């Protein structure tokens, strides 16, 4: 009987670097002083380093950051960075078979990590000592998303991906209302296949 094809990745094979930028919008407890709800879009920057262990499965260390703006009776803003370990699955290779000449792939992913925010203006409602409210905060980060990957050459891919981050309620410095804070981002950029350089 014919044997199934097995794919192996050496220690130096299939590493990649991703550089991207896009927009994000927080879904916190939000409304302006009149009760109307409006989302603010701000820039987000992204860098990731990872490895494809098989044609189907990869992991990456992903770092993203920027500013977040939202209304909570008054205008709020803060700076943030987030890091996560993402687990990626090439859906086309997994369902349609491996094709090294494929020019388009869909890659769902899920991640675990943490996010840190600082320069929160105005400060939230969480006490930080000496009668002051905290202007920095952090929260665990569970995320999920979908990446569209377009092959430009053996060395470079273009990608566009959307990500939803599920953060603890205290991430925006305000502990009431919805128990989970969300941040939604859309990012585009380039993947450099380091093992081919």
Stretches found by the model and what they are:
Residues 19-23, 47-51, 85-91, 110-114, ...:
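Residues on the lipid-exposed face of transmembrane beta-strands in outer-membrane beta-barrel proteins
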Residues 13, 37-43, 77-83, 102-104, ...:
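Residues that define the transmembrane beta-barrel architecture of outer-membrane proteins
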Residues 59-60, 73-74, 78-80, 151-197:
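Predominantly the C-terminal beta-signal and adjacent terminal strand-loop region
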Residues 100-102, 107-157, 162-163:
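Extended, charged alpha-helical interaction scaffolds
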Residues 29-37, 63-80, 118-140, 172-178:
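Flexible, solvent-exposed loop segments that connect beta-strands
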Residues 3-14, 56, 92-106, 152-155, ...:
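Short loop/turn motifs that connect adjacent beta-strands in outer-membrane beta-barrel proteins
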Residues 1-50, 119:
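Short glycine/proline- and aromatic-enriched beta-strand/turn motifs that initiate or cap beta-hairpins
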Residues 55-126:
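Gram-negative (and chloroplast) outer-membrane scaffold detector with strong preference
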């Amino acid at each position: 009987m014919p044997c199934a094809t097995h794919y192996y990745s050496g220690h130096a094979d299939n590493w990649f670097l991703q550089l991207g930028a896009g927009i994000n919008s927080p879904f916190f407890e939000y409304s302006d002083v009149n009760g109307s709800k409006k989302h603010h879009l701000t820039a987000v920057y992204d860098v990731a380093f990872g490895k494809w262990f098989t044609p189907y499965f990869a992991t990456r260390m992903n770092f993203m950051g920027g500013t977040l703006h939202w209304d909570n009776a008054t205008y709020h803003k803060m700076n943030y960075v987030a890091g996560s370990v993402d687990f990626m699955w090439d859906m086309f290779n997994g369902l349609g078979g491996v094709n090294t000449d494929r020019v388009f792939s869909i890659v769902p992913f899920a991640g675990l990590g943490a996010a840190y925010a600082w320069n929160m203006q105005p400060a939230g409602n969480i006490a930080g000592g000496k009668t002051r409210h905290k202007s920095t905060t952090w929260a665990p980060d569970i995320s999920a998303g979908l990446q569209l990957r377009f092959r430009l050459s053996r060395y470079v891919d273009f990608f566009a991906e959307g990500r939803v981050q599920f953060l603890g309620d205290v991430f925006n410095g305000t502990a009431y209302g919805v128990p989970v804070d969300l941040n939604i981002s859309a990012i585009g950029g380039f993947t450099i296949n380091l093992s081919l350089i």
